């Protein structure tokens, strides 16, 4: 897939840019027919990214997960794992000695798209051949439908996560709840 638009933006902004080449697609779509290719792919992609981060001498990485990602992960965890869980805002990876932060956790996907449109930022489409036909897409569509049927439900789901005493999440504070009730 063509990353040229992102590369050009980074050059224009004078931001260092690295591409990590992997064989993840070959692993995921081999004859083994992985039962849960999305989960394995996510783990392998994060592993490759985190390894590059360490090679660059960094000890912290910011993932771009937004509020909708957190809600969708919670829905997936409830449906497929039977637990109330979503990834935490800050995670320390012991084996990598790397801190993962998610600074966009209070930003909705719609706000991200609005920012992208306002500033005419380039978009590189997901090259995955199953994009749009995944369990995550199912969760995204389900949350969208629930929010259409029950306006405000998505924000209430996020508030439930903030208040849910999920391992790795900070204790509930009014600051976190502000605007998400």
Regions found by a protein language model. Name each.
Residues 43-46, 60, 102, 135-136, ...:
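Basic side chains
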Residues 1-74, 80-83, 110-118:
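ATP-dependent adenylation/nucleotidyltransferase module used to activate substrates
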Residues 68-148:
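Catalytic subdomain that performs nucleotidyl-dependent activation
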Residues 121-181:
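The feature marks non-catalytic terminal segments
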Residues 42-53, 90-96, 143, 147-162:
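Short, basic, helix/turn surface patches
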Residues 22-24, 105, 128, 162:
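Residues that form or immediately flank small-molecule/cofactor binding pockets and catalytic motifs
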Residues 3-4, 32, 102, 114-115, ...:
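Surface-exposed beta-strand edges and their flanking turn/coil or helix-capping segments
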